[in-house]
Amino acid sequence: MLDINSLPPWPLVGLAFGVAFLYSSVGFGGGSGYLAVMSLFAISTQLIASTALSLNILAASIAFFIYWQSGHFTPALLWPFLLTSLPAAFLGGYIHLHDTLYLGILYAALAYVGIQLLFWNQSAHPASAPRRFAWPAILVGGLLIGLLSGFVGLGGGIFLSPLIVLNGWGTPKQAAASSAGFIVINSISGLLGRVMGGNFAFGLLSATLLPVGLAGALIGSWLGAHYLSGTLLRRILGIILLLTVLSSLIEFFRV
Protein backbone atom coordinates (compact mmCIF):
# COMPACT_ATOMS: atom_id res chain seq x y z
CA MET A 1 0.00 0.00 0.00
CA LEU A 2 1.44 3.37 -1.02
CA ASP A 3 1.95 5.75 1.90
CA ILE A 4 -0.18 8.90 1.83
CA ASN A 5 2.95 11.06 2.16
CA SER A 6 5.04 9.21 -0.41
CA LEU A 7 5.76 10.56 -3.87
CA PRO A 8 3.55 8.99 -6.55
CA PRO A 9 5.30 6.48 -8.84
CA TRP A 10 6.22 7.89 -12.24
CA PRO A 11 3.72 5.69 -14.13
CA LEU A 12 0.91 7.18 -12.02
CA VAL A 13 2.17 10.72 -12.70
CA GLY A 14 2.18 10.05 -16.45
CA LEU A 15 -1.28 8.47 -16.36
CA ALA A 16 -2.71 11.37 -14.33
CA PHE A 17 -1.36 13.85 -16.88
CA GLY A 18 -2.84 11.78 -19.71
CA VAL A 19 -6.25 11.62 -18.03
CA ALA A 20 -6.33 15.39 -17.42
CA PHE A 21 -5.24 16.06 -21.00
CA LEU A 22 -7.71 13.71 -22.69
CA TYR A 23 -10.76 14.43 -20.54
CA SER A 24 -10.37 18.22 -20.56
CA SER A 25 -10.07 18.16 -24.34
CA VAL A 26 -13.66 16.87 -24.53
CA GLY A 27 -15.05 19.03 -21.70
CA PHE A 28 -14.99 16.64 -18.73
CA GLY A 29 -13.19 16.86 -15.40
CA GLY A 30 -11.66 13.39 -15.59
CA GLY A 31 -12.90 11.97 -12.29
CA SER A 32 -13.63 8.54 -13.76
CA GLY A 33 -10.18 8.47 -15.36
CA TYR A 34 -8.38 9.41 -12.14
CA LEU A 35 -10.33 6.78 -10.25
CA ALA A 36 -9.51 4.17 -12.88
CA VAL A 37 -5.74 4.79 -12.99
CA MET A 38 -5.37 5.10 -9.22
CA SER A 39 -7.27 1.84 -8.71
CA LEU A 40 -4.42 0.12 -10.57
CA PHE A 41 -2.00 1.05 -7.79
CA ALA A 42 -1.90 0.10 -4.10
CA ILE A 43 -3.70 3.21 -2.86
CA SER A 44 -6.35 3.38 -0.12
CA THR A 45 -9.93 3.92 -1.28
CA GLN A 46 -10.25 7.10 0.82
CA LEU A 47 -7.15 8.59 -0.78
CA ILE A 48 -8.34 7.59 -4.26
CA ALA A 49 -11.72 9.33 -3.87
CA SER A 50 -10.32 12.45 -2.16
CA THR A 51 -7.57 12.91 -4.74
CA ALA A 52 -9.94 12.33 -7.68
CA LEU A 53 -12.36 14.97 -6.39
CA SER A 54 -9.51 17.46 -5.88
CA LEU A 55 -8.19 16.89 -9.40
CA ASN A 56 -11.74 17.11 -10.71
CA ILE A 57 -12.20 20.59 -9.26
CA LEU A 58 -9.03 21.86 -10.93
CA ALA A 59 -9.64 20.38 -14.38
CA ALA A 60 -13.37 21.13 -14.56
CA SER A 61 -12.81 24.73 -13.43
CA ILE A 62 -10.61 25.29 -16.46
CA ALA A 63 -13.14 23.67 -18.81
CA PHE A 64 -15.99 25.71 -17.30
CA PHE A 65 -14.07 28.98 -17.71
CA ILE A 66 -13.39 28.25 -21.38
CA TYR A 67 -17.02 27.37 -22.15
CA TRP A 68 -18.32 30.34 -20.14
CA GLN A 69 -15.93 32.68 -21.94
CA SER A 70 -17.20 31.31 -25.27
CA GLY A 71 -20.81 32.13 -24.32
CA HIS A 72 -22.08 28.55 -24.00
CA PHE A 73 -23.03 28.61 -20.31
CA THR A 74 -26.76 28.74 -19.51
CA PRO A 75 -27.40 29.01 -15.73
CA ALA A 76 -30.88 27.50 -16.12
CA LEU A 77 -29.25 24.23 -17.20
CA LEU A 78 -27.21 24.03 -14.01
CA TRP A 79 -28.95 25.27 -10.88
CA PRO A 80 -32.07 22.99 -11.05
CA PHE A 81 -29.86 19.88 -10.87
CA LEU A 82 -27.90 21.32 -7.95
CA LEU A 83 -31.04 21.51 -5.78
CA THR A 84 -30.80 17.79 -5.02
CA SER A 85 -27.26 16.91 -6.14
CA LEU A 86 -25.50 19.23 -3.66
CA PRO A 87 -26.94 17.71 -0.46
CA ALA A 88 -26.76 14.22 -2.00
CA ALA A 89 -23.05 14.62 -2.88
CA PHE A 90 -22.35 15.84 0.65
CA LEU A 91 -24.21 12.86 2.11
CA GLY A 92 -22.43 10.43 -0.21
CA GLY A 93 -19.06 11.83 0.81
CA TYR A 94 -20.01 11.75 4.50
CA ILE A 95 -20.98 8.06 4.50
CA HIS A 96 -18.10 5.62 4.90
CA LEU A 97 -18.33 2.62 2.58
CA HIS A 98 -16.59 -0.70 3.13
CA ASP A 99 -13.76 -1.16 0.63
CA THR A 100 -15.50 -4.06 -1.14
CA LEU A 101 -18.75 -2.10 -1.55
CA TYR A 102 -16.83 0.99 -2.66
CA LEU A 103 -14.95 -0.97 -5.34
CA GLY A 104 -18.16 -2.63 -6.53
CA ILE A 105 -19.91 0.73 -7.00
CA LEU A 106 -16.75 2.21 -8.53
CA TYR A 107 -16.31 -0.51 -11.17
CA ALA A 108 -20.01 -0.39 -12.10
CA ALA A 109 -19.86 3.40 -12.48
CA LEU A 110 -16.65 3.26 -14.53
CA ALA A 111 -18.10 0.59 -16.82
CA TYR A 112 -21.19 2.75 -17.41
CA VAL A 113 -19.05 5.81 -18.13
CA GLY A 114 -16.87 3.80 -20.52
CA ILE A 115 -19.92 2.61 -22.47
CA GLN A 116 -21.31 6.17 -22.56
CA LEU A 117 -18.06 7.56 -23.93
CA LEU A 118 -17.73 4.77 -26.47
CA PHE A 119 -21.24 4.74 -27.91
CA TRP A 120 -22.94 8.08 -27.12
CA ASN A 121 -23.14 10.29 -30.21
CA GLN A 122 -23.13 13.81 -28.80
CA SER A 123 -24.11 15.37 -32.12
CA ALA A 124 -27.30 13.32 -32.31
CA HIS A 125 -29.50 15.76 -30.44
CA PRO A 126 -33.02 16.94 -31.29
CA ALA A 127 -33.12 19.72 -33.87
CA SER A 128 -36.36 21.13 -32.49
CA ALA A 129 -36.65 23.93 -29.95
CA PRO A 130 -35.54 23.08 -26.40
CA ARG A 131 -38.14 21.09 -24.48
CA ARG A 132 -39.56 22.24 -21.19
CA PHE A 133 -37.96 20.87 -18.05
CA ALA A 134 -39.41 17.73 -16.51
CA TRP A 135 -38.90 18.59 -12.85
CA PRO A 136 -39.29 15.04 -11.47
CA ALA A 137 -36.57 13.80 -13.85
CA ILE A 138 -34.30 16.74 -12.95
CA LEU A 139 -34.69 16.33 -9.19
CA VAL A 140 -34.31 12.54 -9.20
CA GLY A 141 -31.44 12.72 -11.70
CA GLY A 142 -29.61 15.30 -9.59
CA LEU A 143 -30.14 13.22 -6.45
CA LEU A 144 -28.76 10.00 -7.95
CA ILE A 145 -25.81 11.70 -9.64
CA GLY A 146 -24.98 13.55 -6.42
CA LEU A 147 -25.02 10.38 -4.31
CA LEU A 148 -22.80 8.54 -6.77
CA SER A 149 -20.42 11.50 -6.93
CA GLY A 150 -20.01 11.59 -3.17
CA PHE A 151 -19.71 7.83 -2.78
CA VAL A 152 -16.91 7.16 -5.26
CA GLY A 153 -15.35 10.55 -6.09
CA LEU A 154 -16.92 11.34 -9.46
CA GLY A 155 -17.97 14.84 -10.48
CA GLY A 156 -21.05 13.55 -12.30
CA GLY A 157 -20.68 15.53 -15.52
CA ILE A 158 -20.54 12.41 -17.67
CA PHE A 159 -24.02 11.50 -16.42
CA LEU A 160 -25.44 15.02 -16.72
CA SER A 161 -24.41 15.74 -20.34
CA PRO A 162 -26.46 12.93 -21.92
CA LEU A 163 -29.42 13.77 -19.67
CA ILE A 164 -29.49 17.38 -20.96
CA VAL A 165 -28.87 16.60 -24.62
CA LEU A 166 -31.09 13.53 -25.04
CA ASN A 167 -34.02 15.29 -23.33
CA GLY A 168 -33.64 18.26 -25.67
CA TRP A 169 -33.04 20.77 -22.87
CA GLY A 170 -29.90 22.22 -24.46
CA THR A 171 -27.22 21.88 -27.13
CA PRO A 172 -24.12 19.70 -26.67
CA LYS A 173 -21.95 22.75 -25.96
CA GLN A 174 -24.47 24.10 -23.44
CA ALA A 175 -24.53 20.66 -21.83
CA ALA A 176 -20.73 20.59 -21.66
CA ALA A 177 -20.64 24.02 -20.00
CA SER A 178 -23.31 23.05 -17.46
CA SER A 179 -21.59 19.73 -16.78
CA ALA A 180 -18.25 21.42 -16.12
CA GLY A 181 -19.86 23.77 -13.58
CA PHE A 182 -21.79 20.85 -12.10
CA ILE A 183 -18.56 18.87 -11.68
CA VAL A 184 -16.84 21.73 -9.83
CA ILE A 185 -19.69 22.40 -7.39
CA ASN A 186 -20.56 18.73 -6.89
CA SER A 187 -16.93 17.79 -6.26
CA ILE A 188 -16.57 20.56 -3.67
CA SER A 189 -19.72 19.31 -1.92
CA GLY A 190 -18.45 15.72 -1.99
CA LEU A 191 -15.08 16.81 -0.56
CA LEU A 192 -16.76 18.74 2.26
CA GLY A 193 -18.83 15.68 3.08
CA ARG A 194 -15.66 13.58 3.25
CA VAL A 195 -13.97 16.09 5.54
CA MET A 196 -16.99 16.25 7.88
CA GLY A 197 -17.40 12.46 7.85
CA GLY A 198 -13.73 11.72 8.48
CA ASN A 199 -13.33 10.10 5.07
CA PHE A 200 -10.93 12.69 3.63
CA ALA A 201 -7.32 11.72 2.95
CA PHE A 202 -4.73 14.05 1.45
CA GLY A 203 -0.94 14.08 1.56
CA LEU A 204 2.18 14.49 -0.51
CA LEU A 205 0.98 11.91 -3.02
CA SER A 206 -2.19 13.91 -3.74
CA ALA A 207 -0.44 17.29 -3.65
CA THR A 208 2.11 16.12 -6.22
CA LEU A 209 -0.63 15.06 -8.64
CA LEU A 210 -2.48 18.42 -8.52
CA PRO A 211 -0.01 20.46 -10.64
CA VAL A 212 0.30 17.49 -13.00
CA GLY A 213 -3.48 17.46 -13.50
CA LEU A 214 -3.55 21.24 -13.88
CA ALA A 215 -0.91 21.17 -16.63
CA GLY A 216 -2.70 18.37 -18.49
CA ALA A 217 -6.04 20.16 -18.25
CA LEU A 218 -4.65 23.46 -19.54
CA ILE A 219 -3.03 21.84 -22.58
CA GLY A 220 -5.96 19.51 -23.27
CA SER A 221 -8.59 22.25 -23.01
CA TRP A 222 -6.70 24.50 -25.42
CA LEU A 223 -6.05 21.76 -27.99
CA GLY A 224 -9.57 20.39 -27.67
CA ALA A 225 -11.09 23.81 -28.33
CA HIS A 226 -9.02 24.35 -31.46
CA TYR A 227 -7.74 21.15 -33.06
CA LEU A 228 -8.72 17.76 -31.66
CA SER A 229 -11.68 15.60 -32.69
CA GLY A 230 -13.96 15.24 -29.68
CA THR A 231 -15.77 12.15 -30.98
CA LEU A 232 -12.58 10.18 -31.60
CA LEU A 233 -11.12 11.13 -28.22
CA ARG A 234 -14.32 10.14 -26.39
CA ARG A 235 -14.24 6.71 -28.01
CA ILE A 236 -10.58 6.22 -27.13
CA LEU A 237 -11.36 7.18 -23.53
CA GLY A 238 -14.26 4.72 -23.47
CA ILE A 239 -12.04 1.85 -24.62
CA ILE A 240 -9.33 2.76 -22.09
CA LEU A 241 -11.85 2.91 -19.23
CA LEU A 242 -13.43 -0.44 -20.08
CA LEU A 243 -10.01 -2.11 -20.37
CA THR A 244 -9.02 -0.61 -17.02
CA VAL A 245 -12.19 -1.91 -15.36
CA LEU A 246 -11.60 -5.37 -16.86
CA SER A 247 -7.98 -5.39 -15.65
CA SER A 248 -8.99 -4.21 -12.16
CA LEU A 249 -11.74 -6.84 -11.89
CA ILE A 250 -9.35 -9.63 -12.90
CA GLU A 251 -6.87 -8.48 -10.26
CA PHE A 252 -9.66 -8.05 -7.66
CA PHE A 253 -10.98 -11.60 -8.05
CA ARG A 254 -7.47 -13.03 -8.18
CA VAL A 255 -6.70 -11.72 -4.67
Segments from the language model and where they lie:
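Juxtamembrane transmembrane-helix boundary motif
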Residues: M1-S24, G33-F41, T45, F65-L148, ...
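Helix-loop boundary and gating motifs at the non-cytosolic
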Residues: G31-S32, G157
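Membrane-interface alpha-helices at helix entry/exit sites of multi-pass transporters
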Residues: I43-S54, A76-L77, W169-A180
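Transmembrane alpha-helices of multi-pass small-molecule transport proteins
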Residues: T51-I66
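Short hydrophobic/aromatic, small-residue-rich stretches within specific transmembrane helices
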Residues: A52-N56, S179-I183, S206-L210
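Structural signal for alpha-helical transmembrane segments and their flanking helix-loop junctions
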Residues: L139-G193
